[in-house]
């Protein structure tokens, strides 16, 4: 199971990003992280922007409520989603 931690404002999800995919989608688990495929290339923050937008749409929150808190320049990221509980996150991501 991938790592999800709840804090006072929301949840932090450990994510492994695969840029330049054919479509934006969840792709299971990889090395304890949620694998996410994104169509955006890893250039000038495009994949990071797409990652925030994808999680915002997935959880039904504004893109501004989703923030990458670690891993800005790598594939492994920690994504913070405000206004979501761990239970809600596990239900949506299962």
UniProtKB/Swiss-Prot annotation:
What's one GO-annotated cellular component? Answer: cytoplasm
Q: Which InterPro entries match?
A: DUF167, YggU-like_sf
Q: Where are the transmembrane segments?
A: none
Highest taxon, organism lineage: Bacteria
UniProt xrefs under Gene3D superfamilies: YggU-like
A Pfam family hit: DUF167
Cleavable signal peptide = none
Question: What family classification does the UniProt entry report for this protein?
Answer: Belongs to the UPF0235 family.
Instruction: Note the NCBIfam families from the entry.
Output: DUF167 family protein
Q: What is this protein called?
A: UPF0235 protein Dred_0717
- What organism is the protein native to? Desulforamulus reducens (strain ATCC BAA-1160 / DSM 100696 / MI-1) (Desulfotomaculum reducens)
């Amino acid at each position: 199971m991938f790592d999800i931690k709840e804090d006072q404002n929301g949840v932090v999800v450990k994510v492994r990003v695969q840029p330049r995919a054919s479509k934006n989608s969840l792709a299971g688990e990889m090395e304890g992280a949620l694998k996410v495929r994104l169509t955006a290339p890893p250039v000038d923050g495009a994949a990071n922007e797409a990652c925030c937008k994808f999680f915002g749409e997935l959880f039904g929150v504004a893109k501004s409520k989703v923030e990458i808190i670690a891993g800005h320049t790598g594939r492994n990221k920690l994504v913070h989603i405000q206004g979501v509980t761990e239970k809600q996150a596990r239900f949506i991501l299962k």
